[in-house]
């Protein structure tokens, strides 16, 4: 469903695009694309897909290990992968990105936003956020919030937290959830404690390319037009 919303929005705004199926990723020439979007989907569905006995063969299965390696090589050679919401968990885990989803294992009894408008603060100086206002709104539907993984160096005096990440894999923070008064419309529980000030969008370098992680769905149901720009800017 998320792929359909994404495709509809891009077609509506006259973006040239291809829908990539499993074999296109595994065996195709990905270098022809400036960006590859991974719509919101579970890691299991991306990697393994649906079983052959539940769907026609052309719609079953996933990209598998070969597809994952193809995506990794694509980014390392200069491509950009754009992950929306749930698919960001898959890329963080499988590509070993130095960032984490801080609400991944948080129980719904302490933090829950089933589908609400939340405030986000944008770093407007970057080309990926061009045209956005510093204060904006995102649609949060059981979505993600990120934080950079701290590196620790063990020396003679014990462990020391490194304040700066080595230049080989920098993380560029593009948007954060507001620190307070996060909820704009809808219902939320535990929002300030769990996502207040956390990263909502980031770009992580990978070889000569990068992975853009958008913790929410900027194109959800083709409705939140104010965040379409975050998706569009990520394509170039």
Task: Please describe what each predicted stretch is.
Residues 101, 108-110, 116-224:
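Catalytic beta-strand/loop cores that center a nucleophilic Ser/Cys/Thr
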Residues 61-71, 110-112, 166-170:
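Glycine-rich, flexible loop segments associated with nucleotide phosphate handling
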